[in-house]
Amino acid sequence: MKEKGKTLNGIIEAACAIAGIAPVGTSKMHEFENYDEYLKNNTATEEQLEEQRKNPLNPAPLISIAIVAKGADVGMLESTIESLQSQTYDNWEACLAFGLDDYGSKGIADTSHFRVVIASGTVKELSDLINHQLRGAYMLQLFPGDILTQDALYTLAQALMDTSSPEVVFADEEMTDENGIYPYFKPDYGRLTIMNHNSVGRPLLVAKRVFDLVGGFKGAESFDIWKFALLALSNSKMSAHIARVLMSSKRRKDVSLSPKEIDEMDRILADRVDKRANAYCVEGHEMGTLRIRYVPKRTPQVSIIIPNIDGIENLKRCIESIEMRSTYSDYRIFVADDKRNEPLIRKYLDALKKTRAAKPIEIKSGMSIPAILNYCARAEINDMLLFINGSCEIQSPDFIEELSGLASMKKAGAVGGKIIDTGGNIVSVGDVIGLRGWAGSPYKGENDDNADRLKSSFTWLQRNVSAVSGSFMAIKAQRFMTVGLFDETLSGVGWDTELCIRLMRRGYENYFTPYAAAKLYGELPDYDDASSDNLTRCYDSFRQTLMTGDGYYNPNYDYAASEPILSIKPYKPICLNPNYK
């Protein structure tokens, strides 16, 4: 079944290339203009470091650090050792593994913290060997050249004391090469995001229970590090993300995933998804990333619901794009019909009904968008609901497969596709709750290109998000009914975001995918134009997330900007909301 799926996927990928969404390779690294200034304001001071030394944590669990030093550059190894010796946290041990031929003068004098293993074998074999030498309650993997900030271990250990009792803790980092310094500000853990790329990176502190369960560190290659992170996080009861740069490492060269590595991810994915579906991976848009294909064993019947409030030309374009481009067959289109006496619309709707191309559903005149969508969803219930703005033109041939597939995942809430405007600019790539004080899409209004890796991580990867646009959204029909449909009191804006918040509170996850794309002829409603009553309801619904920040958007980013730029002094997005007092 999987091989058939991959063959079909190859055909679909070729079609997607025509639509402009085929993999394009590697983007350049993103450089933050104010990173130096940010570090000055967000790095532990000497006074704070001294305070940590004087007041050690209690409890202070033993942290075991694995370092495979086979073939290591002496200077790089020494820099890593020096960074460990300068830690304000003292309860740690480091186990270094050397090959038989490269130990030489790399002796370690500090036997209170360091233990040395000398053995023959590959880096992978030494990594396996060192796993059995670690005695700590928590494990950390470093490589020669990694440099921890002086408070790194203290900060990681401190996070373990959180009331949620995390079993995995990770932090932001920076990578360096001959061309510059590239900080990586990460989102919180998301199960879809980490299946697409290693979104947690390092430093990564893992509890012994999880470490033993997944079989320890996997090796030193990028794929090995990703695999360990994915397995550790998926087997942990809780994780924590420290939104501070705690480590600097040498940037690794971007490489494509080998067929063997992709097959290995297939096996991992098969163990993690609902057994009622076939799931497999193909290489993603960016080199070294993956795209997840989720194919339910029973093809879902899909109800496509179009509110029809944007005129006959837009409606015809929308429906024709579905009919002409879709590679999916088991769907039916439903169009809201408010019985308006416009001859062209009446003639077109009658023709749709006669040819069974779509079924008009009579609604009352003056109903709000969420009310229209709810009414149509109740009237014709199939397995899957797909809401499409009538001003959208479908761009991706397999948009139904992509959206309904991800929406069929066990934990899936709402799934949204990419929306661009007629100029090729971004309208929606998943929404951040708190952007500009309300909610919005990163990079809105900017060209849909892969200018750099940061932008591509938002616009060209399947990922967890807090909210998606209701103008191009899929959700299981039963799940939609169970959580209570769209909130009809939010008549103008926010009804889609409010549903996504409710889904997350029920334990579901919302996903964005760039592989289902639509072009919008017109504009979506904006918070700037909403009524005061509408905004008051939005504020009540969003307030909790506005207070804490969107977990899938790094808190070091400035919520006032439409794209991720650093805030020298990070703040909560509620500060931007005009209703906040």
Where do the PLM segments sit?
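Short beta-strand-to-loop acidic/aromatic patch adjacent to the donor-nucleotide binding site
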Residues: 136-147, 381-395
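A conserved hydrophobic helix/loop-capping motif in glycosyltransferases and polysaccharide synthases
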Residues: 63-73, 87, 302-314, 318, ...
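Short, acidic, metal-binding catalytic loop of nucleotide-sugar glycosyltransferases
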Residues: 81-91, 162, 320-330
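C-terminal, non-catalytic tails of nucleotide-sugar-dependent glycosyltransferases
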Residues: 4-60, 260-302, 423, 435-464, ...
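Conserved donor NDP-sugar-binding/catalytic core segment of glycosyltransferases
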Residues: 151-181, 393-437
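A recurrent flexible, glycine/aromatic-enriched loop bordering the glycosyltransferase active site
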Residues: 182-209, 371, 435-478
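A short, conserved alpha-helix in the catalytic core of glycosyltransferases
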Residues: 210, 221-245, 269, 399-403, ...
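Glycine-rich, basic loop-to-helix element that forms the pyrophosphate-binding segment
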Residues: 119-134, 363-380
